[in-house]
């Protein structure tokens, strides 16, 4: 069937040309605005705005323009359609200030937050709303708003003289056919091979690097990974309930002096547990009045913070392909410019006095063989599993059950296992010598849903230190700008603030403390370091999209991330 396409905008073409003098923006609309009613065999689309002119020619950052239209199904059954921008050209340099939002109050596609308008230097059709279903005789009423957000904290003059043009269309939905893996390879035609694994921060787009992976004694296969300051490894997949604890427009910190905890409140109870302790405009809860008063420069405010929750899209960064052709992802927050690319904070294990506590799961004490019995969940696994249960269970069918998350407990060369004397694990030797590997040779360390020797309850884990080394990190070495992708958000800043985060990889045993590899935050940008298992750090889950997934849209950029098709008939 030939695809039906119906125009929706004010005229056959809406072109907005923005030019700038300093911070002053002007806009010109080409095309007259009129009432338009276009009827196909299946849909009737009515553009209800009386004209398409922006109010005045002179606008500043903060400008917005809205258009309203209706879609009525006059066919004999349910109809599925897409809302697209045809022939989009968007040459704005910034990615986050030019935004759009589609709203509908009568069953149509509805966005709760603004999304970034994708960039395109050449004409490109871009889907804004995918597979919208409308029943026979029903009408969907829409408002589309496009705005240029004002940010007084930055110089927005980089967008001077840039342009935006395109046409909003309705088209009949057609199920996508390209697999995400194929799209990834097509969008990254440059394949490199690295032999030196010092810190790597080179900016790149359209580049993958090749390595190999072997699980147990299975066949070794080629895998492909992103490294350095990769710009096109963004994915939007799943939704989460994002919470915030706010006082006077600022986020509040939860402090527990007894347990030496300092983090974001995890629930409404923590957020409103006490009055506010004001430390010079940094607001805390969880302290008693006497604890607050005992800190220099603070004051006790007899008011409460406010707790709120909202559904948000989840953004991820592609780590690599796996040996089963799935695609492994690292959690990157609820927006590309997030500085909270973590789901909370947790110790790796709340006990440290035995080597077995470096295990993502562990067994009993006394020997490495006993440690690998994997009958107990680590503290961090419990935390990750609970997050998954609360956020991603509806998406389980899209995730690989064979993808491996390697908790390599092999010993370093020349080391002997002991519960009383210090020793090191193999990842310390590899990363110190800049020789990472994707291989996971012992099946009791190769955690996956389908591996009975190291069985996961859910298809989720953590990133290994070897994966972080391949991505561009180096032991005891601070990254320099433009950094490596695992460290940065779309603004080129730390995506997880000053917090560090645990990797999945063991480091060693001191004779009294179990140690795991970890990654530093902004105080020591992206250093691959280590931490006692009892230290609470940020938690960044990792999942793997199955090879059966189809790509619905996107090019991997932060403003136009890859999106997985989650309709019927995929990964069943």
How does the language model describe each region?
Residues 176-572:
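Long, domain-scale functional regions
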Residues 1-61, 160-176:
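Short, polar/proline-rich extracytoplasmic segments that appear immediately after membrane translocation
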Residues 86-90, 334-336:
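Short, solvent-exposed aromatic-acidic interface loops
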Residues 63-79, 84, 88, 128-176:
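C-terminal, structured domain-capping segment
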Residues 31, 76-81, 93-95:
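Short acidic/proline- and small/hydrophobic-mixed sequence motifs that coincide with surface turns
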């Amino acid at each position: 069937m030939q695809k039906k396409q119906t125009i929706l905008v004010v005229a056959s073409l809406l072109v907005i040309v923005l030019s700038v003098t300093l911070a002053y923006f002007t806009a010109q609309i080409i095309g007259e605005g009129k009432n338009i009613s276009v009827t196909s065999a299946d849909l009737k689309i009515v553009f209800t705005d009386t004209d398409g002119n922006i109010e005045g020619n002179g606008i500043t950052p903060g400008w917005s323009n809205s258009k309203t239209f209706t879609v009525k199904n006059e066919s004999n059954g349910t109809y599925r359609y897409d809302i697209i921008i045809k022939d989009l050209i968007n040459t704005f340099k910034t990615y986050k200030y030019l935004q759009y939002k589609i709203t509908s109050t009568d069953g149509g596609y509805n966005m709760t937050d603004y999304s970034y308008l994708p960039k395109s230097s050449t004409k490109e059709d871009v889907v804004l709303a995918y597979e919208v279903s409308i029943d026979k005789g029903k009408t969907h009423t829409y408002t589309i708003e496009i705005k240029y957000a004002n940010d007084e904290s930055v110089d927005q003059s980089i967008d001077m003289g840039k342009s935006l043009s395109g046409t909003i269309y309705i088209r009949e939905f057609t199920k996508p056919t390209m697999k995400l893996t194929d799209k990834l390879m097509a969008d990254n035609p440059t394949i490199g091979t690295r032999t030196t694994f010092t810190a790597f921060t080179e900016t790149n787009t359209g580049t993958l690097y090749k390595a190999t992976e072997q699980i147990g004694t299975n066949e070794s296969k080629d895998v492909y990974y992103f490294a350095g300051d990769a710009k096109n490894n963004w994915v939007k997949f799943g939704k989460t309930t994002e919470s915030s604890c706010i006082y006077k427009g600022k986020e509040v910190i939860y402090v527990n002096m007894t347990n030496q905890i300092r983090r974001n409140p995890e629930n409404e109870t923590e957020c409103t547990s006490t009055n506010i302790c004001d430390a010079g405009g940094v607001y805390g809860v969880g302290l008693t009045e006497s604890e607050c008063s005992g800190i220099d420069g603070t004051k006790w405010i007899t008011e409460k913070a406010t707790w709120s929750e909202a559904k948000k899209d989840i953004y991820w960064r592609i780590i690599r392909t796996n040996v089963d052709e799935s695609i492994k992802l690292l959690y990157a927050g609820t927006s590309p410019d997030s500085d909270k690319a973590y789901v909370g904070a947790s110790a790796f294990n709340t006990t440290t006095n035995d080597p077995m506590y470096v295990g993502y799961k562990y067994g009993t004490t006394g020997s490495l063989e006993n440690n690998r019995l994997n009958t107990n969940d680590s503290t961090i696994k419990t935390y990750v599993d609970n997050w998954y249960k609360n956020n991603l269970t509806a998406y389980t069918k899209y995730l690989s059950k064979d993808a491996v998350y390697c908790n390599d407990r092999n010993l370093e060369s020349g080391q002997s296992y002991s519960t009383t004397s210090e020793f090191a694990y193999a990842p310390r030797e590899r990363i110190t010598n800049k020789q990472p590997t994707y291989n996971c040779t012992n099946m009791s360390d190769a955690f996956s849903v389908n591996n009975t020797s190291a069985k996961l309850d859910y298809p989720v884990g953590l990133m290994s230190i070897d994966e972080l080394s391949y991505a561009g990190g180096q032991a005891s070495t601070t990254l320099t700008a433009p950094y490596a992708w695992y460290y940065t958000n779309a603004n080129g800043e730390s995506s997880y603030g000053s917090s560090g985060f645990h990797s999945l990889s063991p480091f060693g045993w001191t004779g009294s403390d179990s140690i795991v590899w970890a990654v530093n935050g902004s105080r020591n940008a992206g250093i691959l370091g280590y931490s006692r298992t009892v230290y609470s750090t940020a938690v960044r889950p990792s999942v793997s999209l199955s090879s059966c997934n189809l790509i619905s849209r996107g090019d991997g950029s932060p403003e136009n991330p890859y999106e997985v098709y989650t309709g019927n008939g995929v990964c069943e």
